Structures are given as C-alpha cells and as structure tokens.
Curated annotation (Swiss-Prot):
Keywords: Chaperone, Cytoplasm, Stress response. The keyword Cytoplasm applies. InterPro entries: GrpE, GrpE_coiled_coil, GrpE_head. Participates actively in the response to hyperosmotic and heat shock by preventing the aggregation of stress-denatured proteins, in association with DnaK and GrpE. It is the nucleotide exchange factor for DnaK and may function as a thermosensor. Unfolded proteins bind initially to DnaJ; upon interaction with the DnaJ-bound protein, DnaK hydrolyzes its bound ATP, resulting in the formation of a stable complex. GrpE releases ADP from DnaK; ATP binding to DnaK triggers the release of the substrate protein, thus completing the reaction cycle. One of its GO terms (molecular function) is protein homodimerization activity. This is Protein GrpE. Belongs to the GrpE family. It holds the Pfam family GrpE. Gene3D superfamilies: 3.90.20.20, Head domain of nucleotide exchange factor GrpE. It comes from Helicobacter pylori (strain Shi470). The gene is grpE. Homodimer.
Amino acid sequence: MKDKHNQEHDHLSQEEPESCEKACACKEQQGEEMQEASGKECEIKEDFELKYQEMHEKYLRVHADFENVKKRLERDKSMALEYAYEKIALDLLPVIDALLGAHRSAAEVDKESALTKGLELTMEKLHEVLARHGIEGIECLEEFDPNFHNAIMQVKSEEKENGKIVQVLQQGYKYKGRVLRPAMVSIAKND
C-alpha cells in the first residue's frame, strides 16, 4: 500500500511542477496582456487628449472668427448709418444755400423786416439742429486752408495779405469732422 501511495505521490509531484509552470506561464501571459491593455489604454487616452486639444483649438478659432464677424458687422452697420446721414446732409446743403441767399436778399432790402427776422430765426434753428447731428459750417477766418477751402478766384486786396481769404462765396460744411463740401472762397493776390 505504501508503494501505491508513493507512486501517487511521485505522480502528483511530477504533475505539480508542470502545473506550477503552467500557472506561472498563465500569470506571465496575464501580466503581458495587462501591460498590453494598459498600453492600449494609454494610447487611447493620448489620442483622446490630442483630439480634445484639436477640437478645443478649433472651437477657440471659430469663436474668435465669430466675434470678429460680429464686430465687423457692427462697424459696417455704423458706417452705413453714418453714410446715410452724410447723404442726407449733402442733400440739405442746397436748401441751406437757398435760405442763406433769401436772407441776404431780404437783408439788402430791409434789415428790420419781418421776413428778414423770420429767415434769421429759421437759419438759427436750422444750424442748431444741424449741429446737434454733427453738421457744422466751416470757419472761414483769415487763413486759407486747402483742406477746408476751395479758392476759386484770386483778387487784389489792399486790406488783406497774399493768400488770405477775402470773401466767402459759398459756405462749406463738415459732418463729424469730415468735409462735406469745402467753402468756396476768393483769396488775396497782391503782386
């Protein structure tokens, strides 16, 4: 019986190393698989982070483009309104010129007449409204400035030096600092 028991023990002891080897090999294989899975997981995570960065950068660019377009549209809208006001102002200039001419003519006939006074009040109110909207007359003082004045003739003048404004023939106007129409003037030329 001891022999039988020894044989079984020998048989089991021979099987044990094989089982241990198989178990160790299995554990090694599992460890390698875990490392592979961990490596794949890291690779997937890196890919995800790269894609996230790309998408985030695209989002930031699109958002910046959107903000730029929004600002450009606001600026274009503002410029369109500005242009519309400028066009209206240009259309009003002949009316203003006609009122100025009527006032001058009425003042030549009778400075104290009701018509002259009415035209004066009308011109004052018109200039107030125009100034409120950024339209103002160009100053025509002594100095000629080609940015604001258009010299359409030169005249001899004993009172004025060369290049000085002698007479304003047509009033000039500015809209928010930009010249709508330069003032038509005559300048002194004394040779």
